[in-house]
A protein has these predicted regions:
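A short glycine-rich beta-alpha junction/loop motif
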Residues: 1-4, 36-58, 236-244, 275-300
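Non-catalytic DNA-recognition/assembly elements of restriction-modification systems
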Residues: 56-166, 298-337
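Short, ligand-facing micro-motifs at secondary-structure edges
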Residues: 1-2, 15, 28-32, 186-197, ...
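Well-ordered mid-protein domain cores that form the structural environment of catalytic cofactors
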Residues: 8-9, 17-35, 51, 262-265
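Beta-sheet entry/capping signal
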Residues: 177-178, 215-217
Length: 337
């Protein structure tokens, strides 16, 4: 773990301590201990000044068990994704990236050099677009898949939405849409502190920012290619214009899209589309051009898809358990009469 993460070693009821730390009242205490004008931080000794309620053991155990169950579901969700990834690799006969042989002019050199035909330039003069590893991966896909199409194929996606740049107007929670940035899309329960004005941004929200369950999200600048599958509890959230929204053709392909794009080979094909001299980015057209395999065995493709959707459902159930634990803490401890 990073040196910038404080680790609490709990003697018991670690789930209860975790739940307390997530509570808004205790978060306020933590925020009051922050110091630093440029880089804000807290120190381990500051935590000794944070008060948490000493609830009866029965309530501590109840909250602790809910949090532990929530984390068990997260582990099960991750295991399902690993299983789906393994099926994809096996069906496409994908070797580890380090074992894929690529054609370079002089293999003895540390810097790769390679030829590109003028007919294959595709309007791109940047070397990263033409890396030999990309052609090698595509060749493997063509050899082992029934067909290699692109993400923009209407059988794969309805559309890829790139929101325009706009000045954001934030309001209080009751007047706005919950707003997520690219950094939050990998979290189960992002800390939503920003709410876009419904009065000002309604039209843009409906057309470009709104997400629904099983939409595939892809970060399009900065750290390019982080992929997420929208869980049920993010329904109707607004997601930053720095995140592409891939609308699957249907739920029979949504999970499979997520598994492929988040795979090692899928990530290379996706990031290959990167352009920009100062700020690296991809856009909706770039994502639509990413090569995408349709498997020979449709039963395996369906199994991969179903595993991803099951994993997404488990993430939602994990979220509900955590919310229940937070509710118990509020109602039976902090605000108990």
């Amino acid at each position: 773990f990073s040196q910038h993460i404080i680790r609490l070693e709990c003697k018991e009821y670690s789930g209860y301590i975790y739940c307390c730390m997530k509570n808004q009242n205790i978060q306020t205490q933590l925020q009051s201990l922050i110091y630093g004008a440029v880089i804000q931080e807290i120190e381990p000794e500051h935590l000794s000044r944070v008060y948490i309620p000493n609830a009866p053991d029965s309530i501590k155990a109840k909250i602790n068990d809910l949090i532990m169950l929530s984390y068990d579901l997260r582990d099960e969700s991750n295991a399902l994704i690993d299983q789906a990834q393994a099926l994809l690799v096996k069906e496409l006969n994908l070797p580890p990236i380090s074992e894929i042989k690529v054609d370079t002019l002089d293999k003895s050199k540390s810097v790769q050099t390679f030829n590109v035909k003028l007919s294959e330039m595709a309007g791109r003069a940047d070397a990263s677009y033409h890396m030999p590893i990309v052609d090698a991966i595509v060749d493997i896909l063509k050899k082992n898949a029934a067909e290699v199409t692109t993400v923009g194929d209407e059988r794969i996606s309805k559309s890829v939405v790139l929101a325009g740049v706009f000045k954001r107007t934030y309001v209080e929670e009751e007047y706005g849409y919950p707003f997520l940035g690219g950094k939050e899309i990998t979290q189960l329960n992002p800390k939503t502190e920003k709410f876009l004005s419904k009065a000002i941004h309604k039209s843009r929200y409906e057309k470009e920012l709104k997400v629904t369950e099983n939409t595939v999200l892809v970060t399009d600048r900065g750290t390019i290619g982080t992929v997420a599958l929208v869980p049920k509890h993010w329904n109707n959230y607004a997601v930053s214009q720095n995140v592409l929204k891939l609308i699957p053709a249907n739920n029979d392909i949504a999970g499979y899209i997520y598994v492929f794009l988040s795979s090692e080979c899928g990530g290379i094909l996706l990031r290959r589309q990167t352009y920009g001299s100062v700020v690296d980015m991809i856009d909706n057209h770039s994502l639509e051009m990413v090569e995408f395999p349709i498997l020979k065995n449709q039963d395996i493709q369906k199994q991969i898809n179903d595993l991803a959707l099951q994993a997404n459902e488990k993430r939602y159930q994990a979220y509900l358990l955590e919310q229940e634990a937070l509710k118990v803490l509020d109602e039976e401890v902090i605000y108990a009469e």
